[in-house]
Amino acid sequence: MKTFTAKPETVKRDWYVVDADGKTLGRLATEVARRLRGKHKAEYTPHVDTGDYIIIVNAEKVAVTGNKRSDKIYYHHTGHIGGIKQATFEEMIARRPERVIEIAVKGMLPKGPLGRAMYRKLKVYAGSEHNHAAQQPQVLDI
């Protein structure tokens, strides 16, 4: 019996919506990354994108444990000399709450073209509304 290998054109992708209200950031991100990769499916193949689409709502209400709300620091570089910037978790939530979840999930995905394709299937919204009703997403309880 030959080993089954998924083919990109035959992969069936579902849409799921996840409510981040009160969920712990890391625990939410690990499950979302797992589903974006497709590791929850029996036909998972490492070199093929077999994952589903994930919509995350209420990103502004995501929780972190301990003192991370004030102590966790996000860094990025502008590209100019001395252009390192930093922001705490509180500042990030106030400015761009969806970016916090995007950064957490992106770090858990493979680096390279396949990982970027998986990351593009993630849709994050700060509030409770999203514009993907036409895809009829199923509610995913994490």
Swiss-Prot record:
GO molecular function: mRNA binding; structural constituent of ribosome
Lineage: Bacteria, Pseudomonadati, Pseudomonadota, Gammaproteobacteria, Enterobacterales
Pfam families registered for this protein in UniProt: Ribosomal_L13
Protein name: Large ribosomal subunit protein uL13
Keyword terms: Ribonucleoprotein, Ribosomal protein
Known role: This protein is one of the early assembly proteins of the 50S ribosomal subunit, although it is not seen to bind rRNA by itself. It is important during the early stages of 50S assembly.
GO biological-process terms attached to the record: negative regulation of translation; translation
InterPro entries from the UniProt entry: Ribosomal_uL13, Ribosomal_uL13_bac-type, Ribosomal_uL13_CS, Ribosomal_uL13_sf
Gene3D superfamilies assigned: Ribosomal protein L13 (3.90.1180.10)
Family per record: Belongs to the universal ribosomal protein uL13 family.
GO CC terms, sorted: cytosolic large ribosomal subunit
Subunit and interaction comment: Part of the 50S ribosomal subunit.
Superkingdom to which the source organism belongs: Bacteria
